[in-house]
UniProtKB/Swiss-Prot annotation:
GO biological process: double-strand break repair via homologous recombination; mRNA export from nucleus; proteasome assembly; proteasome-mediated ubiquitin-dependent protein catabolic process
Quaternary context: Component of the 19S proteasome regulatory particle complex. The 26S proteasome consists of a 20S core particle (CP) and two 19S regulatory subunits (RP). The regulatory particle is made of a lid composed of 9 subunits including SEM1, a base containing 6 ATPases and few additional components. Belongs to the TREX-2 complex (transcription and export complex 2), composed of at least ENY2, GANP, PCID2, SEM1, and either centrin CETN2 or CETN3. Component of the homologous recombination repair (HR) complex composed of ERCC5/XPG, BRCA2, PALB2, DSS1 and RAD51. Interacts with the C-terminal of BRCA2.
Gene: SEM1
Family designation: Belongs to the DSS1/SEM1 family.
InterPro entries: DSS1_SEM1 (IPR007834)
Subcellular location field: Nucleus
Annotated organism of origin: Homo sapiens (Human)
Protein name in the entry: 26S proteasome complex subunit SEM1
Gene Ontology CC annotations of this record: cytosol; integrator complex; nucleoplasm; proteasome complex; proteasome regulatory particle, lid subcomplex; protein-containing complex
Keywords: Nucleus, Proteasome
Expressing tissues: Expressed in limb bud, craniofacial primordia and skin.
Role description: Component of the 26S proteasome, a multiprotein complex involved in the ATP-dependent degradation of ubiquitinated proteins. This complex plays a key role in the maintenance of protein homeostasis by removing misfolded or damaged proteins, which could impair cellular functions, and by removing proteins whose functions are no longer required. Therefore, the proteasome participates in numerous cellular processes, including cell cycle progression, apoptosis, or DNA damage repair.
């Protein structure tokens, strides 16, 4: 129990803290399509009667949550 622990050398960890420099890009000068679609128009799934929804509804009702149906 009289052994003293050697301090841990953290020199290698500190080297990882440096960041790589990248040249600045001119994004303002790019021609962009005004009508570009970022995602599909039908991204919102309106089908609330699929298997997952039914299982989730049943599980929530088991825990006391009352689900409203349209």
């Amino acid at each position: 129990m009289s052994e003293k622990k050697q301090p841990v050398d953290l020199g290698l960890l500190e080297e990882d803290d440096e960041f790589e420099e990248f040249p600045a890009e001119d994004w303002a000068g790019l021609d962009e399509d005004e009508d570009a679609h970022v995602w599909e128009d039908n991204w919102d799934d309106d089908n609330v009667e699929d298997d997952f929804s039914n299982q989730l509804r049943a599980e929530l009702e088991k825990h006391g949550y009352k689900m409203e149906t349209s």
